[in-house]
Structure formats: C-alpha cells, structure tokens
UniProtKB/Swiss-Prot annotation:
The gene is rimM. This is Ribosome maturation factor RimM. Signal peptide: none annotated. GO terms for cellular component: cytoplasm; ribosome. It is found in: Cytoplasm. It comes from Xanthomonas oryzae pv. oryzae (strain KACC10331 / KXO85).
Length: 170
C-alpha cells in the first residue's frame, strides 16, 4: 500500500469477547460482516500507534461482530485495544456497480443546482432507511435526498461535482 493512499474508516474495537483474545467490533460496512472481506487492515490505537494486520478472521455472533487478530491470544491484550480504529486502503474496496457510489467517494465533492448556483461541499451522508441524504455545507447546511433522477441529476468525479435539482432557498 502506498503511504499516501486514501484510507477508509470501516470500524473499531469496542471490547473483548471471552478470554481467548477475541475482539468485539463495531462495523460500518453494509452488511456489517463485509468488514472481513477487505484486508489488510490498518489499525490505529487511541495512542496514535498504527500497524498493518493481515489474516483477520471473524463472524457474526448475535448482536456482536467477533474478530480474531493473528497473534492476539488473551483478554488483557484485547482490553488494551479498546477504541482501536480499523481502516483499509481505498483500493481494497471493489469498484462500485454502475450508478452506485461509496459515500466516502462523494465526500468533498462540490454541489450546484441545475441552474449553476453553488450550494457548497458534501460534508457527509446518512441513511434514513428509505433513502440516503447528502449533507451539503456552504453558506448554510442543506440536506438533500440522494435520489436519482428526482433530486440528483449527475455525479461527475472528473469535474468534482454533483448537480442537483434543488431550490437554493430551501
């Protein structure tokens, strides 16, 4: 992995499971167990220390996601890892399907209306269950449903631009 390659935060260690060095994870992938598909992991401890881990295995266990890190075999080691963030290189993710996007790829894109009015920059996205919402920060914050073709007309990564059909006063 190149040192300057973009990293994607996929989850974090939230606790220990049992006494044999298994970890409870919080995963932000969809489905949550997809986190195990993307490796190697770059893990960053709360202290800021980073390391690369290959060969992580895991499983769904009720409400929890359980992981086994190579070389971690006791609960004390796991307890010290609480809060550790899990990243992967952006290149570890498969290309999205046509007309699908990774949220992280949309962040920082400029947003303007079909009339050319600049609304701001994508701060982040969230899901409402029925659709995703793009949060745009400019002269003020706007929340625009990320729905094609009703509100979102185009996404152009080369131009760093999302064009929306949205009233700038709303």
């Amino acid at each position: 992995m190149k040192q300057t390659e973009r990293r994607i935060l996929l989850g974090r260690v939230v606790g220990a499971f049992g006494v044999k060095g298994e970890l409870k994870l919080e995963s932000w992938t969809e489905p949550r167990s997809a986190i195990f598909r993307y490796q190697p992991w770059i893990v960053r401890a709360p202290s800021g220390q980073e390391s690369v881990i290959n060969g992580v295995r895991g499983r769904d266990q009720g409400k929890n996601l359980i992981a086994v890190f190579p070389g971690v075999a006791d609960r004390d080691t796991v307890e010290a890892m609480h809060g550790t963030e899990i990243y992967v290189a952006r290149s570890a993710l498969p290309p999205p399907k046509p007309d699908e996007y990774y949220w992280v790829d949309l962040e920082e894109l400029q947003v303007e209306t079909v009339e050319g009015v600049k609304l701001g920059t994508v701060s982040h996205l969230f899901s409402t269950g029925s659709n995703d919402v793009v949060v745009v920060r400019g002269d003020r914050e706007r929340m625009i449903p990320f729905v094609f073709p009703d509100f979102v007309k185009s996404v152009d990564f080369e131009a760093n631009l999302i064009v929306v059909d949205w009233d700038p006063d709303f």
